[in-house]
Amino acid sequence: ECIGHRRSCKEDRNGCCKLYTCNCWYPTPDDQWCKCLL
């Protein structure tokens, strides 16, 4: 499992999530967080 700050799920394709399912939630209007799960 990998958790990281991302501006969007699409951008995270270049990060740790690229082989996993990316679930995003929005702690603030200006930020998104991705949690990558197997």
UniProtKB/Swiss-Prot annotation:
The presence of a 'disulfide through disulfide knot' structurally defines this protein as a knottin. Keywords: Disulfide bond, Knottin, Secreted. Its main location: secreted. Belongs to the neurotoxin 02 (plectoxin) family. 09 subfamily. One of its GO terms (cellular component) is extracellular region. The keyword Secreted applies. It is found in: Secreted. This is U9-ctenitoxin-Pk1a. Disulfide bonds join 2-17, 9-22, 16-36, 24-34. The keyword Secreted applies. Expressed by the venom gland.
